[in-house]
UniProtKB/Swiss-Prot annotation:
Enzyme Commission number(s): 2.7.13.3, 3.1.3.-
Membrane-crossing residue ranges in chain numbering: 20-40, 283-303
Protein name, UniProt field: Autoinducer 2 sensor kinase/phosphatase LuxQ
PROSITE patterns per record: HIS_KIN (PS50109), RESPONSE_REGULATORY (PS50110)
Domain Histidine kinase, residue spans: 490-712
InterPro entries from the UniProt entry: AI-2_sensor_kinase/phosphatase (IPR053413), CheY-like_superfamily (IPR011006), HATPase_C_sf (IPR036890), His_kinase_dom (IPR005467), HisK_dim/P_dom (IPR003661), HisK_dim/P_sf (IPR036097), LuxQ-periplasm_dom (IPR015387), LuxQ-periplasm_N (IPR043056)
Response regulatory domain location: 735-850
Gene Ontology CC, one term: plasma membrane
Subunit structure: Binds the complex formed by the autoinducer and LuxP.
Keywords tagged on the record: ATP-binding, Cell inner membrane, Cell membrane, Hydrolase, Kinase, Membrane, Nucleotide-binding, Phosphoprotein, Protein phosphatase, Transferase, Transmembrane, Transmembrane helix, Two-component regulatory system
Known catalytic reactions: ATP + protein L-histidine = ADP + protein N-phospho-L-histidine
Modified residues (4-aspartylphosphate): 784
Length: 857
């Protein structure tokens, strides 16, 4: 765009400043005009409103005063001797003479007509009523309309001369001697064409004219016909007249006895002085506008003469420097701001030139390849590093035709097209030969669109190789972890299977042996098996924690169940060992808590088992407390497990929760254990979003503190569980199908079931189980997992899907993996029991079976 085009498109600074000043002055003038007009108009309106209110009040006062004087005269006349004598002797001459003298004494406050009545009807009238078209009949009608009180009454009466609007009042005439009411004395004020009343209101209120209305009808007025307005225009302007009209109208509604009537009075006053004030105000505002306009023109001329030359010099310098040619120093300006702008431009141009050289050096000497492409995909420029990687020695067309560059351009082209549409691309891997480069593409966005694309590359060949090695190592680690998990699962199955036989036989022997020495030997066998099972469970739990497969399942449960379990398990153990065991509970027994009951029990079992193991004598105390904190959605279950055992050295407290760690090697040899119990406890507490800490003193004991967030549920009445004897659990013998390939396990389960008077049929694989189920009906199926020919999971699925049987299936497996349990449940099993199966555990499962599935025949 040329300078001439720029000049046509843009305005000069002098013109812009002039227009801004003109605009500012104009806005100020308009603001002053609006403000002045608003306040002046408001003041005039307030003054007009005040005048109207004063006039209205004066008119109302004059009208009421006129009625008050008439009322005073009326009441005074009714007590006069002449009127009383008329009722007694009928001397109307004296009566008429009396009223004539009264009218002459005060002609202004004289009623239009008078009349007297008795109980028998009209007695006398002054004859003036006929001038208003009111005859004797109408007088009777008036007297009948005004029967009560001595107040003024407004009425509209159809007379012989048309509709008449009048005010009527009566006053009783009383015989002062006897107190007898002789009759009624009536007076009437006719409002129609009542010129004396109108003139009195006009002169008293200092008004130019008075118009009396009944509703919208004019009944009397003082207009002569020479006024610049007529009755119709006055009626149109009476409610909302302009404050600047030539006349001011005050509308006064008339009240009779504090009651609104249809009568109202318009008072018209000249308003020329207000209109004159308005015209003078407008003239003053117009003069102000003209003066402001002249001042703006003078300022414009001064700015153009003072600023234009200096500004033109500055513009010439900027145009010269902007051409890209070598520029000269700025010559300066008399105006401080222009001089500052000129020297700033001078410094800016120098800095831009320096930056251009720096950017060019950065581009040329960068170790990473850099290129500039056009939006159409043509190479504009590349730095030496890019030329080196692409095998280009000189920027000639022959060098750009080599296969390496053409292959690179072919792979980069799709990304160039995306960047040409405005997208910024990062992390694009495009190789050059054997090397892999990661490229970033950034479009150069200017006012008219995209002028080019900057492409920057980084050699990531080493990084890619390292990533490949990392992925390989990760896959090997995952395979190793999977192999270890599979090994643990197999070892768990291989250990649990014979362990089920050992513990099962031990439990059977415990019931049948009576000799104390033999019973002691059986206890050793049971304890050894239990210890081996605990070590195995700890190893499997630790493996699950390492693999992140330990799941938390929160639900509502009765806290009493946990207390009862701890009491039943550890009190006999402690009693046998000679250790005092106490539980201090501050939580209501019927309280419902919401957390993972299984993991909470596991935490307590580990901590209390450790306390029992490492406390040869003394006491073990467990305390529970539920705390609620303000502005917290959860309660805190505070647990404290204390013992008076061997204690822990202070230097070993920091590592006590690490895996395979005990206080010292002597403890391991003397007390045994895997060293995983506290590690599992700490991980479980953290999974429950809680905290655990320990205080201990060597040879004095240890105390573990736990804080676990829980949700408190509704309290329920605690029911004492019943524990029937095995032979009484079922009313009749159950038919049980036992699917087990191991003879020892089958023997033990059959022995356990015989205590419950069950009829057990034993098959050794899934195929035999299906054949047996086709021929016979069973109440319960006990299903092993790893079976010959057809496994337990597959057999369970066949029972549900092929045979369509709903017989409860309780899986009995030595595989403690969660995945195995889920596979069994998905196939259709109702429960999963992990071997080795203890007698009490089987009893609990049979209680569950009775409560949920068994129907007594």
């Amino acid at each position: 765009m040329t300078n001439e085009q720029l000049q046509r498109k843009h305005q000069s600074l002098a013109t812009l400043i002039t227009r801004i000043i003109f605009l500012v002055l104009g806005l100020i003038t308009i603001g002053i005009f609006i403000q002045s007009y608003y306040f002046s108009n408001k003041i005039i309106k307030q003054e007009v409103m005040l005048t109207k209110q004063q006039t209205s009040a004066l008119v109302k006062s004059l009208f009421n005063n006129h009625l008050s004087i008439l009322q005073i005269h009326h009441d005074s006349n009714s007590k006069n001797e002449a009127i009383r004598r008329f009722f007694l002797d009928g001397d109307d001459e004296k009566l008429e003479y009396y009223f004539l003298s009264m009218d002459q004494a005060d002609p202004t406050h004289t009623p239009e007509f008078r009349f007297l009545t008795t109980g028998e009807g009209l007695l006398w009238d002054d004859g003036n009523a006929h001038f208003y078209g009111v005859n004797e009949v109408l007088l009777e009608k008036i007297s009948q309309s005004v029967l009560f009180g001595n107040n003024w009454h407004f009425m509209s009466l159809h007379t012989l001369m048309g509709l008449r609007n009048m005010l009527v009042r009566r006053s009783p005439v009383i015989d002062t001697t006897t107190g007898e009411v002789l009759g009624q004395y009536y007076i009437s004020v006719v409002l129609d064409n009542n010129f004396p009343l109108v003139e009195m209101l006009e002169s008293g209120s200092n008004s130019d004219n008075i118009v009396m209305l009944v509703g919208d009808k004019v009944i009397s007025h003082s207009l002569s016909g020479n006024e610049p307005y007529d009755l119709d225009s006055l009626l149109a302007m009476r409610d909302e007249p302009s404050a600047f009209d030539d006349c001011l109208i005050s509308h006064t509604p008339i009240e009779i006895n504090s009651t609104d009537t249809l009568v109202s009075i318009l008072a018209i006053q000249e308003n020329s002085h207000v209109a004159s004030l308005q015209r003078q105000h407008y003239l003053g505002l117009a003069t102000s506008v003209v003066l402001m306009l002249m001042l703006s023109l003078a300022i414009r001329s001064w700015i153009q003469n003072r600023v234009a030359n200096a500004l033109e010099s500055l513009m010439a310098y900027s145009r010269f420097a902007g051409t890209g040619e070598k520029y000269e120093r700025f010559n300066g300006s008399d105006i401080l701001e222009f001089a500052h702008i000129g020297h700033t431009l001078e410094n800016t141009f120098e800095q831009l030139e320096s930056q251009r050289r720096s950017f060019q050096d950065l581009f040329n000497f960068a170790l990473s390849p850099m290129m500039v492409w056009s939006e159409s995909g043509l190479l504009i420029q590349m730095n030496p590093a890019a030329m080196k990687e692409l095998g280009i020695e000189h920027a000639s067309p022959q060098d750009f035709s080599n296969p390496l560059f053409q292959l690179f351009k072919l792979k980069l082209s799709p990304h160039l097209k995306m960047a040409a549409q405005g997208a910024t691309l990062t992390g694009i891997n495009v190789p050059i030969g054997e090397k892999i480069f990661r490229w970033n593409l950034s479009p150069i966005v200017v006012e008219n669109g995209i002028s080019g694309i900057i492409v920057q590359g980084q050699d990531i060949t080493t990084l890619i190789d390292a990533e490949k090695q990392s992925n390989l190592a990760r896959r090997e680690a995952e395979q190793s972890a999977k192999t270890r998990a599979d090994f643990l699962a197999k070892m768990s199955h291989e250990i649990r299977t014979p362990l089920n036989g050992i513990l099962g036989i031990a439990q059977l022997l415990k019931r049948s042996v009576n000799d104390a020495e033999n019973l002691k030997q059986v206890d050793v066998l049971c304890n050894s098996g239990e210890h081996l099972l605990a070590v195995l469970n700890d190893i499997l739990d630790f493996s699950k924690i390492e693999q992140g497969k330990f799941n938390i399942k929160k639900r509502d449960f009765n806290f009493y169940d946990t207390l009862n379990t701890l009491e039943n398990i550890y009190r006999p153990i402690c009693r046998e060992k000679g250790v005092s065991f106490e539980i201090h509970n501050q939580i209501p027994l019927d309280c419902q808590l919401h957390t993972d009951q299984v993991r909470l029990n596991q935490i307590m079992f580990n901590l209390i088992s450790n306390a029992v193991k490492f406390t040869p004598a003394g006491r073990i105390e467990v305390s529970f407390k539920l705390e609620q904190f303000a502005r917290s959605e959860h309660s805190i279950l505070s647990i404290q497990v204390s013992d008076t055992g061997i204690g822990i050295d202070e230097s070993k407290l920091e590592s006590i929760f690490e895996p395979f760690v005990q206080a010292d090697s002597l403890s391991t040899r003397e007390y045994g254990g895997s060293g995983l119990g506290l590690t599992i406890v700490k991980n479980l507490v953290e999974m429950l979003e809680g905290e655990i800490s320990v205080q201990s003193e060597l040879c004095k004991g240890s105390t573990f503190y736990l804080s676990i967030p829980v949700e408190k549920g509704e309290c329920e009445e605690q029911k004492t569980p019943t524990n029937p004897k095995p032979e009484q659990l079922f009313g009749q013998g159950l038919k049980v199908l036992l699917v087990e390939d191991n003879h020892t396990n089958a023997f033990i389960l059959k022995a356990f079931c015989q205590k419950y008077q069950m009829s057990v049929e034993w098959v050794q694989d899934g195929t035999q189980a299906l054949e047996k189920l086709k021929e016979h009906a069973f109440d319960l199926i006990l299903m092993d997992n790893q079976l010959p020919k057809m496994g337990g999971i597959e057999a369970t699925r066949e029972i549900r899907e092929t045979l369509k049987l709903g017989t409860p299936i309780y899986a009995c497996t030595a595989d403690a993996q969660e995945s195995t349990k889920q596979e069994f449940l998905s196939a259709g099993a109702n429960r999963v029991i992990v071997k080795p199966i203890k007698e009490q555990e089987l009893h609990d499962e049979l209680l569950h079976f009775k409560a949920h599935y068994w129907v007594e025949h």
